[in-house]
């Protein structure tokens, strides 16, 4: 899950080893719009730009139209239920599916049991207000820390997996 203040430093730590494994990316509407306005012209010399522009991007939205997907290469609109789409995509042979840039999308997939890992970036900032990743009433979900890395700017990149018990 990518959050505020995402710098090249954080992207490098977060995605350094993952990019080679990811075959598909799932994005929410807002995240796709933001990223579609930046990454296509970011310069292919940036490692993440080359990756995100080339990878198939599946967009979860009730308001975007299939024609909107022309704004960014390799983008397609998820038709129908996103959970069914992700289940079907997971059933196909291939690498990792990454859900990026969409808190409500990540929340939905996690609570549906469709995420095998959850990566959170903790920034050394006290915001005092803003959206919460997990709303009141979210059921308890037990996770196990799989890895943690600190960036040179003090961000913590924490990756959790499903706990076996």
Regions found by a protein language model. Give the residues of each.
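Periplasmic plug
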Residues: 117
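Portal/gating segments that form or line small-molecule/metal binding sites
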Residues: 1-114, 124-165
